[in-house]
């Protein structure tokens, strides 16, 4: 799967090689989108969610859709899973607001499919005090996994892990930071798996 943030969604193709566009946000500036591999996944059902707003959201609206979640059937595992693209409020907001958004996002994923394996990838904008965030997401039944290298290098003060993954019921094997492209954030590659039905 491919999770995007800050994309120009109006220009995204419906097909990207072996990938199909499950859905994208259409009414805001955050440009979330999710592609899935057709040969492995099918029957995508997507939904966008608004999360608690900060001052940045009020001044630079529209930023209402901060979560795009897609439920798909994983043909290899023989079960449904949830994948999500997420974008938290920027550093002008407090960590407490981002924790609130992350918690609300996890609750939204549960509402889509309680008990289903879920993985949420994106720009968490949480480079400092991630140890506290690990404990916070654990209360929701989620694990937090950082990548092997920092994902944002633009500002000396705020360099760090901005982009990472939270998951529930998914074994995350590794998260790698890839070489920088045109974005100011470095992309990450998440490798993981869910158990097959019957295992």
State what each model feature region is:
Residues 1-80, 178-179:
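Structured beta-strand-rich core segments of catalytic domains in phosphoester-bond hydrolases
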Residues 27, 61-65, 96-104, 157, ...:
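Soluble or luminal CAZymes and related metallo-dependent hydrolases
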Residues 109-117, 124-199:
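Metal-dependent phosphoester-hydrolase catalytic domains
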Residues 1, 89-95:
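Second-shell loop/turn segments in exported
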Residues 1-4, 119-123:
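Short catalytic-loop micro-motif centered on adjacent basic/acidic residues
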Residues 69-84, 96-121, 130-135:
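His/acidic metal-ligating clusters that form di-metal
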Residues 7, 86-88, 122-124, 186:
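Active-site metal-binding loops of divalent metal-dependent hydrolases
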């Amino acid at each position: 799967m491919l999770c995007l943030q800050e994309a120009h969604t109006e220009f995204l193709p419906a097909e990207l090689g072996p990938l199909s566009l499950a859905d994208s946000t259409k009414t805001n500036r955050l440009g979330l989108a999710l592609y899935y591999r057709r040969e492995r996944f099918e029957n995508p059902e997507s939904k966008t969610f608004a999360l608690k707003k900060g001052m940045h959201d009020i001044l630079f609206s529209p930023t209402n859709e901060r979560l795009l979640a897609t439920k798909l059937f994983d043909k290899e595992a023989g079960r449904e899973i949830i994948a999500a693209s997420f974008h938290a409020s920027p550093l002008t907001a407090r960590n407490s607001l981002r924790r609130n958004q992350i918690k609300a996002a996890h609750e939204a994923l549960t509402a889509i499919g309680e008990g289903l394996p879920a993985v949420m990838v994106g720009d968490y904008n949480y480079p400092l005090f991630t140890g506290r965030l690990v404990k916070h997401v654990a209360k929701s039944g989620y694990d937090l996994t950082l990548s092997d290298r920092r994902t944002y290098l633009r500002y000396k003060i705020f360099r760090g892990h901005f982009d990472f993954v939270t998951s529930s019921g998914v074994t995350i094997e590794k998260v790698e930071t890839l070489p920088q492209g045109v974005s100011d954030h470095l992309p990450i590659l998440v490798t993981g798996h869910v158990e097959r039905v019957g295992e």
